[in-house]
């Protein structure tokens, strides 16, 4: 075979799988995401590939997204007045948990209130730059340190590993002399909200420390498939099919009960939980279950603030410069500020 034919064969061997992958992804785009009534102050959620396909192509798409997100977060530059640090925290099984630490510039070595930020992403997606953006806003406005663990994703290590990575990060925060131990905040969005809720339960049950507060943003709280919003908004920004796959990968066939920490709604003892803020997006399959967890905590005697955001969708707060988003960030900051010195 001539050199030219060899080159063409190699190019075809490379491009053909890429082309097949692209075509399959195009057939899986959620075209119905724009069918709902969103706030006119927010950009409509963009169409994207449905994460609900649990097969080879679905896995490849997730890996591709994670590769891009990991690259972007590594290259992310902190805004003026903020320092971004990279640290590693030992996990209980010997793994080193990579973490980003976002802190007000000039205060890196001071004792500060500290937030554990459990990022969202269906337990199988890695951290995104929008979460670093939000962490920077909190660090600046609250003059606190924000620690974001890059916990192992469920594709590689299902429950309980992602939870324990976050909890072991909280243990390191508690042991750090630069932490104001009386003002530790636990925060999470989406699946990170599930992790944050479970970390808070575990922390209170084991007596690690007394968190000043927990903040759960459009959180995953239950694996039941009976909430009306799961059908009402099944094709919205976070689709029902993706939610089903999320739980399948996270639990990995494990039978969960109220005695463990996989599903916040199943946990039986909630009365010792700290002051809590739960935010739900109105146009979101997770709206009902977030409100249900808030109600369960209220019934247990927990001081709970439930904030419903009209016209908002799952992940609506990705652009911290949007006026609608900034208004909600200010609401969160005001609430968090009420529990800090």
Task: List each model region and its residues.
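Beta-strand-enriched cores of mature, soluble protein domains
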Residues: 57-58, 68-72
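N-terminal Sec-pathway targeting helices
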Residues: 1-19
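A domain-start/cap signature at the N-terminus of enzymes
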Residues: 73-87
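General helical structural elements
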Residues: 8-9, 67, 336
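Alpha/beta-hydrolase superfamily serine-hydrolase fold, recognizing
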Residues: 22-36, 42, 48-64, 83-341
